[in-house]
From Swiss-Prot:
GO MF, one example: 23S rRNA (guanine(1835)-N(2))-methyltransferase activity
A GO CC term assigned to this protein in UniProt: cytoplasm
Record organism: Enterobacter sp. (strain 638)
Role, per record: Specifically methylates the guanine in position 1835 (m2G1835) of 23S rRNA.
Protein family according to the UniProt entry: Belongs to the methyltransferase superfamily. RlmG family.
Keyword set, alphabetical order: Cytoplasm, Methyltransferase, rRNA processing, S-adenosyl-L-methionine, Transferase
Alphabetical list of Gene3D superfamilies matching this protein: Vaccinia Virus protein VP39
Pfam families: MTS
Protein name, as recorded: Ribosomal RNA large subunit methyltransferase G
Localization per Swiss-Prot or TrEMBL: Cytoplasm
HAMAP family assigned to the protein according to its UniProt record, in alphabetical order: 23SrRNA_methyltr_G
Upper taxonomic lineage: Bacteria, Pseudomonadati, Pseudomonadota, Gammaproteobacteria, Enterobacterales
Entry EC number(s): 2.1.1.174
C-alpha cells in the first residue's frame, strides 16, 4: 500500500498483483505526481482520457471528471477498479476502453503514461489524432530514462508541436499540441512467416516480440509435448504460436488461449483463423488475469512463457500468480510446462508450489521445466 497526495484527492493505492513485503513496489511513480501537478481542477472541460494508467493512480485522482481509462492491460483495469473501491470511489466514475476501441471525440485533456512498447504508443497516438483538437491539452509522462528522442519524434510526427520539461524526481513530461502534421499511413499489424511452417503470424501493436519469434519461445516450441488430450491452456498466449503448435501436435486436445492483453488475444484468434481454421472448434479465447474465475481441476496441461516485468518494473509477481492459478486449475496428474531465463530460478519456485519440478531441456540462456499436480492440497 502506498499513499499519494495530489491536488485532487488523497489516495491509498496498491499494486495488482500485490508485491510481497520483502520487495515492496509502490503503485504510483513521480510521473503520476508530475502529470497531476499540471492540471487545475477548475480548468478541465470536455472528456478526460487517461492512457496506460498501470494501477489507476491518475484515474482515481481524476474520478470527479469521469475519465476514460484506455490501455491494453486487463490487469491495469482490475488494479484501477480495486483502488477505486479501496478509496471509496464509485467504480462507475471511470469508463474503461481497450486500445482498439474508438476514443471519445474532442477530449479536453489527454494524459499518457508512456508504455514499454513503442508500437503501442504509436497506435494510441494515431487513434488520438482522429479525435483531438488544437485545444486539447496533451501531456505524457514517464521516468526520464524512458523518454527518448524516438519518443519525442513520434509525438511530433503524429500529433504536432512537442516540447519536454526538465526532470523532476527523475520524471519528465512531454507537452504536445495538435497541429495536424501530414502523416503517412503505417501498418498497424506486423506479419511474418514462422520458420519451419506454412504459417503467417499476425501481431497487433502491443504483442510481445511482434517483429519475430523471440528466442525463448523458439526454444519452447522445440520441446512442446505431443501426447496431450483433453483441455490444455496457452497461458499468457501473446500471438498464440505456442497454442497453434499445440493444436497441430495434439489433434485430440483443445486449447484455451488466454492473456491479460486484448491485443494478444485478438492476435491469437486471428492466427488460428488464418493458419488453422479447421481447429477453431477446438479453441477458446479469453482476456483474463491468468486463470481467475476458471474452475479448478479442469485442465490436463498448462503451458506458459511467463513475463518477468510489469510495464517498466522488473517483478516475478505476475509469473508467481500464473503458477498458482495453473496448479489450482490442473487436474490431478496435470502438467505445467514453462520456459524461462535460467537466472530466474523458477525451478525452486515451482518445486515450492507443486512439490516437484523436472528440467526438460536447457541451453546457455533458457530452461524448459515441468511440474506435476500430485495432490489436492494447496
Amino acid at each position: 500500500m502506498s499513499h499519494l497526495d495530489n491536488g485532487f484527492r488523497s489516495l491509498n493505492l496498491k499494486r495488482f498483483p500485490e508485491t510481497d513485503d520483502v520487495n515492496p513496489l509502490q503503485a504510483w511513480e513521480a510521473a503520476d505526481e508530475y502529470l497531476l501537478q499540471q492540471l487545475d481542477d477548475t480548468e478541465i472541460s470536455g472528456p478526460v482520457l487517461v492512457l496506460n494508467d498501470v494501477f489507476g493512480a491518475l484515474a482515481c485522482a481524476l474520478a470527479e471528471h469521469t475519465p476514460y481509462s484506455i490501455g491494453d492491460s486487463y490487469l491495469s483495469e482490475l488494479a484501477t477498479r480495486e483502488n477505486l473501491r479501496h478509496n471509496e470511489i464509485a467504480e462507475s466514475s471511470v469508463k474503461f476502453l481497450d486500445s482498439t476501441a474508438e476514443y471519445p471525440q474532442a477530449p479536453g485533456v489527454v494524459l499518457i503514461k508512456i508504455p514499454k512498447t513503442l508500437a503501442l504508443l504509436e497506435q494510441q497516438l494515431r487513434a488520438l489524432r482522429l479525435v483531438v483538437t488544437p485545444q486539447t491539452r496533451i501531456i505524457a509522462g514517464a521516468k526520464a530514462r524512458d523518454i527518448h528522442n524516438s519518443t519525442l519524434e513520434l509525438f511530433e510526427k503524429i500529433l504536432g508541436t512537442t516540447t519536454t520539461t526538465l526532470a523532476w524526481k527523475k520524471a519528465r513530461l512531454i507537452n504536445c499540441t495538435f497541429t495536424e502534421p501530414a502523416l503517412v499511413d503505417a501498418q498497424q499489424m506486423l506479419s511474418w512467416k514462422l520458420e519451419g511452417t506454412d504459417w503467417t503470424i499476425h501481431n497487433h501493436a502491443n504483442v510481445f516480440s511482434r517483429t519475430g519469434l523471440d528466442i525463448g519461445a523458439r526454444f519452447f516450441l522445440e520441446h512442446l509435448p505431443g501426447n496431450l488430450e483433453g483441455e490444455i491452456v496457452d497461458l499468457g498466449c501473446g500471438n498464440g504460436v505456442v497454442g497453434l503448435t499445440l493444436l497441430e501436435k495434439n489433434p485430440e486436445a483443445s486449447v484455451l488461449f488466454t492473456d491479460e492483453s486484448p491485443m494478444a488475444v485478438a492476435s491469437s484468434r486471428l492466427n488460428v483463423e488464418t493458419n488453422m481454421p479447421e481447429a477453431l472448434d477446438r479453441c477458446e479465447f479469453m482476456i483474463n488475469n491468468a486463470l481467475s474465475g476458471v474452475e479448478p481441476f479442469r485442465f490436463n496441461a498448462v503451458l506458459c512463457n511467463p513475463p518477468f516485468h510489469q510495464q517498466h518494473a522488473l517483478t516475478d509477481n505476475v509469473a508467481w500468480e500464473m503458477f498458482h492459478h495453473a496448479r489450482r486449475c490442473l487436474k490431478i496428474n496435470g502438467e505445467l510446462y514453462i520456459v524461462a531465463n535460467r537466472h530466474l530460478d523458477y525451478f525452486h519456485k515451482l518445486k515450492k508450489i507443486f512439490g516437484n519440478c523436472t528440467t526438460i531441456a536447457t541451453n546457455n540462456k533458457f530452461v524448459v521445466l515441468k511440474a506435476v499436480k500430485l495432490g489436492r492440497t494447496r
